[in-house]
């Protein structure tokens, strides 16, 4: 739950679809008098688990998630920037063929983002022993990869 500039709240919660086995992330925006302003569901047919969540400006929020890809039967890191009215400003997927998960996210001094998570694609490449994974992006969520 995050306090908004107008004195309201933005609340993130998990939605479980018991019949389909997928999870979604729900967002509920409450105004200063605790009235519902809007709700949004992110996920749908692909399972998603929200992790890191924080306010990054007066009217924008950033969330790190792990997004399940049914076609690959694995997770990817998923980063979403959300406006105060519930609109998705941008979203980015990071990862490869095996499980890659985003755990936490912070805004960096240059306006970009640092994401911490785990990977089975990079590092030792062992599917059963994930490595720490750090991603640095610019303010629009773009990143570059460097080989060893």
Where are each of the predicted segments found?
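A sequence-level/structural motif corresponding to short, flexible coil/turn segments enriched
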Residues: 1-148
